[in-house]
Design a protein with these regions (language model features):
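FAD-binding core/adjacent interface of flavoenzyme oxidoreductases
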Residues: 1-9, 25, 30, 76-144, ...
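Beta1-alpha1 glycine-rich phosphate/pyrophosphate-binding loop at the start
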Residues: 4-74, 144, 156-182, 254, ...
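Residue-level detector of alpha-helix initiation sites
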Residues: 12-13, 36, 112-114, 153-154, ...
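Short amphipathic alpha-helical segments
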Residues: 19-20, 43, 118-121, 159-161, ...
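Glycine/Thr-rich phosphate-binding loops of Rossmann-like dinucleotide-binding domains
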Residues: 40, 116-117, 156-157, 179, ...
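A Rossmann-like FAD-binding core segment of flavoenzymes
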Residues: 69-95, 100-101, 164-262, 302-321
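Predominantly flavin-linked oxidoreductase catalytic cores and closely associated redox partners
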Residues: 99-196, 205-211
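FAD-site-proximal beta/loop scaffold in flavoenzymes
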Residues: 118, 124-140, 236-288, 292, ...
Length: 321
């Protein structure tokens, strides 16, 4: 059992930014990294839109985040949270595979994952033609032909963004009606680079001899016809899945499972904060998540200042339990 002033759950940009701010406030935060250090960022081939860096890989950025926070006294733990108890108020219990933490404040930055198609070839070609982020990877498809899977706002917004680079963007949707808002629909339908393939699902993503995507195998769900469509890239926008299941029944979420926070990144539990993609279903950028994490870190610092008189010394609290 360890008692901490601040426990941060998640090692994406929001988590590291929260760690930086709370570490520089001398709070010695512990950041529980989860199963994949850096989350979605570490899987990003190249990042060109994080301020101050013209180009670096996601993994490089995560390593910089880690050495920065450790320099100021944050502790990064390679472990995953298995259970939390926020029901009795602060201090909260956070259990990992290897440790139990008693935390005066908790900052939840556990992120969301792009929903996967779960078809053969998808996992294999991530970063080699398969992408879940047009803003991150569109630039690498200049003059290329790409397909986009999905029919919601993200699919259309990202398709429009991709037309800045790609020669053509074909939107593959499983129905013949788009879920996206009418304005986006109208902009997409007017764009000469965008075409639609209706009532169609991707059955497989196929690679070429060079190890990158060369085609998709499609199935028309109405006629049953199966055929190959050559493409240089497959952008998948079929929604995100926030990793909020572990907090079910404790932290309030919206209908899509995103944790609800106020402008100070406070959740419904006093002393528990959330930042980044676990509570933001709109922006999903490294830079915006980092900003939100910094703000959540500052909110936790303020919370600890306001409750200074009630906080138990760290050693005493552990002996009592
Ligand atoms: P979404 O609205 O849930 O749309 C997901 C799309 O993917 C739907 O068209 C869905 O098809 C399709 N889909 C889901 N699972 C699939 C599967 N296994 N195979 C093939 N297709 C599948 O997700 P989103 O577009 O990411 O949007 C999420 C939220 O963010 C929404 O509330 C949206 O309004 C908001 N958002 C807003 C903006 C904006 O306002 N500018 C931009 C982006 C996102 P069906 O239609 O058949 O269900």
């Amino acid at each position: 059992m360890q008692k901490k002033r601040v426990v941060i759950i998640g090692s994406g940009p929001a988590g590291f930014a929260a760690a930086l701010y709370t570490a520089r406030a001398q709070l010695k935060p512990v950041l529980i990294a989860g199963n994949a250090l850096g989350g979605q960022v570490s899987q990003t081939h190249e990042i060109e839109n994080y301020l101050g860096f013209e180009s670096l890989s996601g993994m490089e950025l995560v390593q910089k985040f880690q050495s920065h926070v450790e320099h100021f006294g944050a502790q990064v733990v390679y472990d995953a949270v298995t259970e939390v108890d926020f029901t009795k108020g602060s201090p909260f219990t956070v259990k990992t595979h290897g440790e139990t933490y008693l935390a005066d404040t908790v900052i939840v930055t556990i992120g969301a994952d792009p929903r996967k198609l779960k078809v053969p070839g998808e996992a294999e070609y991530i970063g080699r033609g398969v992408s879940y982020c047009g803003t991150c990877d569109g630039f690498f498809f200049r003059g290329k032909d790409v397909v986009v899977v999905g029919g919601g706002d993200s699919a259309l917004e990202e398709s429009l963004f991709l037309t800045r680079f790609a020669n053509s963007v074909n939107i593959i949707h499983r129905r013949d009606t788009l879920r996206a808002g009418v304005q986006l629909q109208s902009r997409a339908k007017k764009n000469e680079k965008i075409s639609f393939t209706w009532n169609t699902v991707v059955e497989e993503i196929l690679g070429g001899d060079d190890g990158s995507v060369r085609a998709v195998r499609l199935k028309n769900v109405q006629t049953g016809e199966v055929y190959e469509k050559p493409t240089d890239g497959v952008f998948i926008f079929i929604g995100h899945v926030p990793n909020s299941q572990i907090f079910a029944g404790q932290l309030a979420t919206n209908d899509n499972g995103y944790i609800i926070t106020d402008q100070r990144y406070r959740t419904n539990v006093d002393g528990v904060f959330a930042a980044g993609e676990i509570q933001d279903e709109i922006w999903r950028q490294v830079i915006t998540s980092a900003g939100q994490g910094a703000a959540a870190g500052m909110s936790a610092i303020h919370w600890l200042e306001e409750h200074e008189d009630e906080l138990q010394p760290l050693e005493e609290a552990v002996q009592e339990t």
